[in-house]
């Protein structure tokens, strides 16, 4: 995927130049090959606390710079204090940039990305239990390959317009449940939703991970509110929950969507604008660590959290076992914060104004727990 938006990028570089200290351009040598990358360091990072790391992988023929601004996670990194790295792939025999995600011989990109994690951790304070991978197209393929081959290091993955090659699917050997999110358009002509030569259909990919993670076989689903009626597409959100170690599988099906990143400011085809893919991917990632949900998504037992009634046509009551101060955040299906407040009692009521799927997150110290609620 080549993104033709150099004029747009020039303006972004001019703005980013005011804060040049936040983007580091560096490289490592792996297997005798010079491999470079861009690292975005949020202003909140001070090195005193270990922070998550997100790998953001470009598509075929694209590069780290284009991916930084097209699949833009910088607002999420700023708001949530995580490191964001955009590495470059190598060049294939057509002299195009790519990730070796298709099972053939060539550069050891799994080894490179593992070495990159180590290199970054040597310089920065990385929480190695919270390393995630996402990517566009070929970068999505590569994220799936990491889920298969580097599941001991990658806590969760998300693919936008990617899939798994049939070779990789048949040889996938993850050593633990891996939370997976796929965002894909039904009108994607580059990586067809229903598969093609060597490309696994998206429903089959979802089934593989639902089975591997031992999730509930039937998904909860909800239409994403069609807030932008001129973008030429709509979206539906599927969640397979109940997996081992708290794992889930999520899928955003973009009905009529093309080979594009939802919410992107750069239009390279039919792009869904009803939700922000980057915000949703971070919402998904933030629930998980290598140990499952324990490190980032589970309150201590003395602070149990329940929601009732659920589903509800009106209000939801949140109940806690103690009165420790907690931050309550209500997030809608498109990743927007609807409510956020602090509570010190053992009960509080939340009242979403519109029907739909929401996520309630409770933050207590370093712990974050999320539950899904549905307003009828």
Go through the PLM ranges and name each one.
Residues 18-53, 134-158, 164, 204, ...:
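A domain-start/cap signature at the N-terminus of enzymes
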Residues 218, 289-308, 314, 321-323, ...:
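Residue-level detector of functionally pivotal "anchor" positions at catalytic/ligand-binding pockets or at interdomain
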Residues 1-23, 293-296, 310, 319, ...:
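Bacterial Sec-dependent N-terminal signal peptides
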Residues 24-132, 145, 149, 171, ...:
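Serine-hydrolase catalytic machinery in alpha/beta-hydrolase-like enzymes
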Residues 330-338, 358:
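Short, glycine-anchored, charge-dense loop/turn motifs used at functional sites
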Residues 355-376:
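C-terminal tail/sorting-segment detector
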Residues 182-184, 188:
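Short beta-strand/loop motif that positions the catalytic acidic residue
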Residues 24, 314, 354-357:
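A glycine-anchored, Pro-Gly-centered beta-turn/N-cap motif
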């Amino acid at each position: 995927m080549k993104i033709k938006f150099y004029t747009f990028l020039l303006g972004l570089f001019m703005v980013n130049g005011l804060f040049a200290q936040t983007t580091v351009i560096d490289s490592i040598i792996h297997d005798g090959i010079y491999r470079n990358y861009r690292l975005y360091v949020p202003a909140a990072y001070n090195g005193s606390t270990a922070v998550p790391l997100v790998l953001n992988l470009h598509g075929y023929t694209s590069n780290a710079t284009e991916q930084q601004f097209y699949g833009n996670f910088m607002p999420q990194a700023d708001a949530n204090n995580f490191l964001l790295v955009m590495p470059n792939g190598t060049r294939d025999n057509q002299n195009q940039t790519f990730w070796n995600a298709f099972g053939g011989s060539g550069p050891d990109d799994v080894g490179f990305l593992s070495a990159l994690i180590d290199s970054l951790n040597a310089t920065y304070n990385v929480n190695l239990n919270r390393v995630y991978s996402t990517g566009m197209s070929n970068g999505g393929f590569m994220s799936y390959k990491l889920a298969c081959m580097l599941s001991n290091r990658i806590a969760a993955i998300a693919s936008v317009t990617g899939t798994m090659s049939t070779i990789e699917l048949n040889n996938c050997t993850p050593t633990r449940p891996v939370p997976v999110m796929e965002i894909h358009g039904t009108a994607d002509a580059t990586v067809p939703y229903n598969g093609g030569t060597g490309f696994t259909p998206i429903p089959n990919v979802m089934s593989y991970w639902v089975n591997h993670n031992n999730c509930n076989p039937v998904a909860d689903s909800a239409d994403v509110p069609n807030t932008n009626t001129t973008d030429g597409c709509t979206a539906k959100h599927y969640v397979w929950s109940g997996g081992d170690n708290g794992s889930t599988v999520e899928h955003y099906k973009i009905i009529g969507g093309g080979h594009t990143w939802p919410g992107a400011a750069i239009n390279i085809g039919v792009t869904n604008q009803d939700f922000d893919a980057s915000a949703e991917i971070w919402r998904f990632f933030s629930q998980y660590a290598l140990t499952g949900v324990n490190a980032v998504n589970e309150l201590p037992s003395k602070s149990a959290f329940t929601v009732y009634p659920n589903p509800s046509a009106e209000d939801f009551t949140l109940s806690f076992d103690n009165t420790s101060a907690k931050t309550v955040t209500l997030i809608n299906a498109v990743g927007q914060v609807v409510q956020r407040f602090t509570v010190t009692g053992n009960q509080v009521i939340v009242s979403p104004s519109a029907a739909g799927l929401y996520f309630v997150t409770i933050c207590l110290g370093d712990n974050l727990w999320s539950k899904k609620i549905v307003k009828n």
